[in-house]
């Protein structure tokens, strides 16, 4: 049995920042994540994706963001339990006991759920024989964008991933077709502005009012993508690569059975300290829902800070927290509060 102050479920960017925030408050952390490495979707799905809304970084790729967050958390010696899921929760007096899928047992006073989308997988378009092209011509995630240099690429979708990747790949691709069923994109307004500016050149062509209809190729190598509009008019796009970005399937797994208020794959929390309906359990980042929620990494960072400041009195048995700015703290100090 491991004893600690805080268990953080999820080692994505918000979970890693929660480690830092806990450490600054003198709390020891154990972190559980289902992936083999820390970083969550930023590493597993899109390590080379540029992120534009992190303060002080005009642009930072996801992999570098995770590297910096891990370095920031490192002085507080978090214990990572990777490649395993939190499957059982038992409450005993003022403590929680968590059991993982590898039978790891951890006892803590506070739980921070920063599990993002939970277990995730891509929403695939319903195209005949799409599996024949997957991993060679059809990709749902981008781990190495250099493989797309000089290619003719069809990107399908209208959200942040579709728009951001169209912009990012336009520097190296021969041609990009961005297919969306509407003329209006749901990505960040500045990203949409950049997209439309690039589309004035021949690097990106916006195919709006159309949806994917069929794939054509041989031996797993794509030759063209057929798209169709609402009037059933079709158009053939010469392409080597298809990148469908239609979001992720979400599965909370065992978390859904913990007695938390769950709605549409999200955990309901209060909007002040992001505590769930179970005292001592908080949810932050994309998995948390409250009125006015913004699904941004920086929002998750703020939620991490607020939730852990609120959890302080629980960890330290009612002791009041005297707020300090980070410039007055020793970031190398170690926690002395670990649960006995």
UniProtKB/Swiss-Prot annotation:
It comes from the Bacteria. Keywords: FAD, Flavoprotein, NADP, Oxidoreductase. It holds the Pfam family Pyr_redox_2. SUPFAM superfamilies: FAD/NAD(P)-binding domain (SSF51905). Its cofactor is FAD. Its EC number is 1.18.1.2. Transmembrane segments: none annotated. InterPro entries: FAD/NAD-bd_sf, FAD/NAD-binding_dom, Fd--NADP_Rdtase_type_2, Ferredoxin-NADP_redctase_2. Binds 1 FAD per subunit. FAD binds at residues 33, 41, 46, 86, 120, 286, 327. GO terms for molecular function: ferredoxin-NADP+ reductase activity; flavin adenine dinucleotide binding; NADP binding. Gene3D superfamilies: FAD/NAD(P)-binding domain. It catalyses: 2 reduced [2Fe-2S]-[ferredoxin] + NADP(+) + H(+) = 2 oxidized [2Fe-2S]-[ferredoxin] + NADPH. Belongs to the ferredoxin--NADP reductase type 2 family. Homodimer. This is Ferredoxin--NADP reductase.
